[in-house]
């Protein structure tokens, strides 16, 4: 932090504070810290980066399969334990990556073909897939089907790169059985915000956790998400800024030197007088792994979840119970009891819910847990 002509310059940097490449067989976990940030910057960056991680990072997946001898998805094959539908679900779970592991360099988006030719008895796994030389399976032991006798299993696979669950081609254009592929390599992403330095100051720290399926590292996923956001904002840059603002009022021109992006850090010049009235978030404890140059103090824990922030701007009680994302059985039981919104649900106690047909103690506990975690609401035990 450097003081210049009445202004405070904050130089924010990303640091990897925890890396677990062998978190489990199919997950790579990393935690990153970005600091120092001004108040509200951490929330803005955290929401944007998390959204980009889950929807903008490219991955490779099987998009369709042509199974020899299969008439339709619900048919069975002689000598094969699994139905065609189960085989397709197993193929959907196969995790594929570039052979060199360099997922930052995207493929050319053309369609690739792979094949399976196996003869039983035995278990057919991802190891039996004959991939093109440029791609391979992350977990070769992933099960596909079980052959009970000397039956032969022949499958032609169609593979493509994409983003999240979006695919431009339609089901009609796919050969064989369509597979609802999920391309995203990022399995989970969370962030939390912590205060650093003087409790009356304007500095915050952003902690970002990323889990990937090992097709690329969390650091590579973060790089892709960052690049995607830069490209997006470059495309939607307002064209009138430079035309309508005079040079003396053009904020972009005034701060062009301090706001330049370079490497893994960026600078931001902000007047203290204009930011002292900014809204302060509650302070939280800082993990021991992080030792930045600024002085750290421990305050009340305030992990800020995205759902909680979004729900502050809507009338939660008028939301449908579908927003609780309960199991279909629980949701149907509530709707049959004419409980269609969260407001309807809050009119019931836990004891009242137990009187609903097929609604047991575990169902009540699940509803209470979701209300508490997502909406900070409680169901009264009794009236």
From Swiss-Prot:
InterPro entries, per database record: DNA-dir_RNA_pol_insert, DNA-dir_RNA_pol_RpoA/D/Rpb3, DNA-dir_RpoA, RBP11-like, RNAP_asu_C, RNApol_insert_sf
Record carries keyword Chloroplast: yes
Record text about domains: The N-terminal domain is essential for RNAP assembly and basal transcription, whereas the C-terminal domain is involved in interaction with transcriptional regulators and with upstream promoter elements.
Enzyme class (EC, first level): transferase
Native source species: Staurastrum punctulatum
Positions of the UniProt region annotated as Alpha C-terminal domain (alpha-CTD): 306-383
Entry keywords, A to Z: Chloroplast, DNA-directed RNA polymerase, Nucleotidyltransferase, Plastid, Transcription, Transferase
GO biological process, one term: DNA-templated transcription
Region described as Alpha N-terminal domain (alpha-NTD): spans on this chain: 1-240
Designated name of the protein: DNA-directed RNA polymerase subunit alpha
Gene from which the chain derives: rpoA
One GO CC term, this protein: DNA-directed RNA polymerase complex
Function text: DNA-dependent RNA polymerase catalyzes the transcription of DNA into RNA using the four ribonucleoside triphosphates as substrates.
Superkingdom: Eukaryota
Similarity section: Belongs to the RNA polymerase alpha chain family.
EC number of this enzyme: 2.7.7.6
Subunit structure: In plastids the minimal PEP RNA polymerase catalytic core is composed of four subunits: alpha, beta, beta', and beta''. When a (nuclear-encoded) sigma factor is associated with the core the holoenzyme is formed, which can initiate transcription.
Catalytic activity of the protein: RNA(n) + a ribonucleoside 5'-triphosphate = RNA(n+1) + diphosphate
């Amino acid at each position: 932090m450097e003081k210049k002509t009445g202004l405070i310059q904050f130089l924010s940097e990303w640091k990897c504070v925890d890396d677990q490449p062998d978190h489990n067989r199919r997950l790579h976990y990393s935690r990153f810290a970005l600091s120092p940030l001004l108040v509200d910057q951490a929330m803005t960056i955290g929401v944007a980066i998390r959204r980009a991680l889950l929807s903008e990072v490219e991955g490779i997946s099987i998009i369709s399969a042509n199974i020899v001898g299969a008439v339709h998805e619900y048919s069975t094959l002689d000598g094969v334990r699994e139905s065609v539908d189960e085989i397709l679900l197993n193929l959907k779970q196969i995790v594929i990556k570039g052979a060199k592991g360099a997922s930052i360099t995207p493929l050319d988006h053309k369609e690739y073909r792979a094949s399976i030719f196996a003869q039983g008895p035995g278990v057919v796994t991802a190891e039996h897939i004959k991939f093109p030389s440029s791609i391979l399976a992350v977990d070769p032991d992933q099960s596909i089907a079980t052959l009970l006798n000397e039956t032969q299993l022949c499958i032609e696979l169609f593979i493509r790169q994409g983003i999240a669950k979006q695919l431009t081609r339609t089901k009609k254009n796919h050969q064989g059985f369509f597979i609802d592929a999920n391309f995203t390599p990022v399995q989970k992403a969370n962030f939390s915000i912590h205060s650093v330095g003087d409790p009356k100051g304007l500095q915050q720290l952003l902690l970002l956790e990323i889990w990937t399926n090992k097709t690329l590292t969390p650091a590579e996923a973060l790089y892709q998400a960052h690049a995607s956001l830069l490209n997006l904002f470059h495309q939607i840059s307002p064209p009138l800024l430079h035309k309508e603002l005079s040079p003396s009022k053009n904020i972009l021109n005034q701060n062009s030197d301090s706001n330049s992006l370079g490497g893994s850090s960026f600078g931001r010049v902000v007047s203290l007088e204009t930011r002292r009235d900014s809204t302060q978030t509650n302070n939280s404890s800082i993990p021991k792994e992080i030792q930045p140059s600024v002085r750290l103090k421990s305050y009340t824990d305030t992990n800020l979840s995205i759902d909680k922030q979004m729900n502050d701007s809507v009338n939660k009680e008028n939301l449908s119970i579908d927003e609780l994302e309960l199991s279909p059985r629980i949701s149907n039981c509530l709707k049959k009891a004419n409980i269609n919104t969260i407001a309807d649900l809050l009119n019931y106690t836990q004891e009242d819910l137990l009187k609903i047909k097929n609604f047991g103690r575990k169902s009540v506990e699940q509803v209470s847990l979701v209300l508490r975690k997502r909406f900070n609401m409680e169901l009264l035990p009794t009236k």
